[in-house]
Amino acid sequence: MTMMMSDLPNDLVEEILSRVPITSLGAVRSTCKRWNGLSKDRIVCKGDANQQFTGFTRYVNESTVCSMRLDLNEIQNEDVELVELSINKINKFIELELFQVYYSDGLLLLVTDEVDSKIVVWNPYLGQTRLIQCRDTEHFKYRYALGYDNNRNHKILMYNRKNCEIYDFKSDSWKVLDIIPDLHTNIYVRDMSIKGNTYFFYRGEKIGEGLAGCLLSFDFTRERFVSCLPLPFQIAKFDDNVALSSVREEHLVVLFNNWEESEMEIWVTTKIEPNAVSWSNFLTFTHFRIKFLVTSFFIDQEKKLAVVFGRSLSKQMRCNIAYVIGDNGYLRILDFGVTFIPSNLPVSYAPSLVKITQGQELSVIEEKKRSRLLASLVYSTLFVSFIIFFSFISSVFI
């Protein structure tokens, strides 16, 4: 008697699903209805989570979101001359002109640079999307942050130097905060979400007078920016390079690239709260004599290595590259050409079961087509109106 997939005992099914790579999630869900249901009730496909880097970024020429994957074992294998970088476009958003990509708690926030005043929140693991209407038609001129409060209610912070608003997923509404964020942040420094709160690198205006740089955090429970937290290094010049990352969104990781001393340091928090922080050195790499603007990175604590993404600033080689740095000084260069926008280099991704739909899930592509159709009708109406107007004027004066 042949046993069907749907007849397998639960413990065996869970064991199978735990060993499948996350890149095979689609195949798992199409196997049978039972497996599809299980994959949406719990996180499966953990088989090679510790062996691969999975992230999302955006293409430079097409402004569309794509997923990317790096095999960490392959990176460490010196016998492998060419490390495979798996990049796939997300067809679901092929119609969107993306401007920025933000990440928190398994959710991606996609910001367009179009005038329909909408942003998109997407849970790649559950396949859910949510369109959010912004109050400002120039929403693409803001910066954003994702987070959640003590009740696990997710929110979006939308801010610039003059205005600060917050969106509540539960109430599906925006409100203006009575604070003005005096953020002197470098556009290439990505903020990072840790335990629901967002941390920003804050650079002071005058080196040597007060704090040259610190961590400014936004508390999504209190809906306030809170006091600056000290960094584990001293910034000596404005062009010293700082970047942020995280470990499973539980520990903040900060990278300091001191060009003058040709030294790169990476530190990990042993404690992180809105009002307190402590640090431990992860690795220090000396004699790093390459002019390199770090914009994104991730670390593997077990393998004791870091993969640092960024852009070479040398006149001979202006391209997007990654350096693999190990505890023993191991260094390997991965050249990605011009695939990525420097400020949108990969964000590390971990799946989550956060449900973001409210009522019927909206189709991003259908909404995009609807907006284009509406714009086309408006332009057509204006064009016809102009023709009628000029025809009338001509008939009067002839």
Curated annotation (Swiss-Prot):
<dbReference type="InterPro" id="IPR011043">
    <property type="entry name" value="Gal_Oxase/kelch_b-propeller"/>
</dbReference>
<dbReference type="InterPro" id="IPR017451">
    <property type="entry name" value="F-box-assoc_interact_dom"/>
</dbReference>
<dbReference type="InterPro" id="IPR036047">
    <property type="entry name" value="F-box-like_dom_sf"/>
</dbReference>
<dbReference type="InterPro" id="IPR006527">
    <property type="entry name" value="F-box-assoc_dom_typ1"/>
</dbReference>
<dbReference type="Pfam" id="PF00646">
    <property type="entry name" value="F-box"/>
</dbReference>
<dbReference type="InterPro" id="IPR001810">
    <property type="entry name" value="F-box_dom"/>
</dbReference>
<dbReference type="InterPro" id="IPR050796">
    <property type="entry name" value="SCF_F-box_component"/>
</dbReference>
<feature type="domain" description="F-box">
    <location>
        <begin position="2"/>
        <end position="56"/>
    </location>
</feature>
<dbReference type="Pfam" id="PF07734">
    <property type="entry name" value="FBA_1"/>
</dbReference>
<protein>
    <recommendedName>
        <fullName>Putative F-box protein At1g67450</fullName>
    </recommendedName>
</protein>
